[in-house]
């Protein structure tokens, strides 16, 4: 829903007999039929699907509803993913895998080029996730003195919160992945390709805004 896999923004609890489920069943027959068609892909009897399960299904593409738990289809997909390595082990290639690599690489390139930072094209960089040091980026763009001000005055969580509130871009705090403070994480896995240039643009705009605040303190 937010393009931030693994980030839980809240907890939802609901009585088994709730008003939402009742209101759905009080809808006109044609509207109920349309709703049932929506969930028929993942539920053989969608009319009995609890409202809270509908929310879980709608938190992503409904066809991916099973990813809210380790289901048999998900286990089968894991097996198929593992078997794809046999293709490359035999010296062959796979058009789908090659296309996925191309798409992820293009998104990564758009991101780092937009930020004006050097790309890491080493074999160990899968480019699935990108870790960005916002303090280092601040120094590269506006100098050491600004970095000192920025690092002393704002935590990376302040940057992330403002980025989401003002620019609608939600990224992850890298500390949860074992990084040092100041690192934010971008996933190249799940957003439209055109979004990565926009993410870079919004990060740059926010850094510029912080720099303007810094310059005002110097007057």
Show where each model-derived region lies.
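PLP-dependent class I/II
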Residues: 1-219
């Amino acid at each position: 829903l937010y393009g931030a896999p693994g980030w839980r923004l809240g907890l939802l609890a609901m009585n088994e007999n709730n008003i939402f489920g009742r209101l759905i069943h009080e809808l006109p027959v044609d509207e109920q039929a349309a709703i049932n068609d929506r969930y028929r892909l993942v539920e053989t009897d969608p009319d009995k699907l609890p409202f809270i399960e509908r929310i879980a299904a709608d938190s992503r593409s409904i066809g991916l509803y099973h990813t809210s738990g380790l289901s048999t289809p998900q286990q089968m997909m894991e097996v198929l993913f593992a078997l794809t390595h046999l293709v490359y082990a035999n010296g062959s290639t796979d058009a789908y895998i090659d296309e996925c690599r191309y798409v992820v690489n293009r998104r990564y390139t758009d991101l780092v080029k937009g930020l004006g930072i050097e790309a890491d094209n080493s074999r160990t960089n899968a480019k699935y996730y990108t870790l960005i040091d916002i303090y280092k980026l601040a120094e590269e763009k506006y100098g050491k003195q600004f970095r000192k001000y920025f690092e002393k005055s704002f935590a990376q969580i302040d940057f992330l919160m403002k980025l989401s509130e003002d620019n609608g871009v939600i990224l992850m705090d890298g500390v949860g992945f074992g990084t040092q403070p100041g690192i934010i994480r971008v996933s190249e896995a799940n957003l439209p390709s055109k979004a990565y240039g926009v993410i870079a643009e919004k990060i740059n705009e926010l850094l510029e805004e912080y720099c303007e605040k810094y310059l005002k303190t110097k007057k």
